[in-house]
Amino acid sequence: MTTRAARGEVVPPRADWPEPAPQTEAGALLTEVVLTTFRLNARVLDAAQQLAAAGGLTAAWWQVLGGVLDQPRTVAEVSRRMGVSRQGVLRIADLLVERGLAEYRTNPAHRRAQLLACTEAGYWAIRQIAVVTHPWTDRIGEQVGAADLRSLLATMQRLVKVLETADGQENSAL
């Protein structure tokens, strides 16, 4: 029986598999960080879904609406800030507008790219979420500790910056 891999190619016998280069300590640690981030992401998304329900939103709606709380932005700007696809943000933005949680405004800087802005109903939904989110983040934050969270945040921001500047350079994934 022939075994096929995820991309559809035939899986060769194990004896013919390529050997990966040995990892440095930093590379092995980064691998563990990535795998742990997958686990953390799943837990955070589960919690976000429950928290967002307090405002009548989904986690994805909360994420997109959160991208325009401080100022109106284009869908492309929101997608870049959130690190998600433009098409996904557009689909959710249209739903938010349809439900009155956001609105499209004329963009003086670009005729075709409208600005997405939060409405009073959107701000109200976010306030309802904040009422349940703050006690949750306080409780979890106290268990981890402010100093550790500050250090973690700085490291995560640095890693994001390294990965974002890696596009087209030797740091890119492929």
Name each region found by the language model.
Residues 44-88, 99, 171-174:
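N-terminal helix-turn-helix DNA-binding core of bacterial DNA-binding proteins
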Residues 30-52, 126-144, 149-163, 167:
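Hydrophobic alpha-helical core bundles mediating ligand binding, dimerization, or RNAP-core interactions
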Residues 1-55:
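N-terminal leader segment of winged-helix/HTH proteins
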Residues 4, 94-154:
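Charged, amphipathic alpha-helical coiled-coil/dimerization segments
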Residues 67-70, 76-79, 94, 148, ...:
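A general secondary-structure boundary signal
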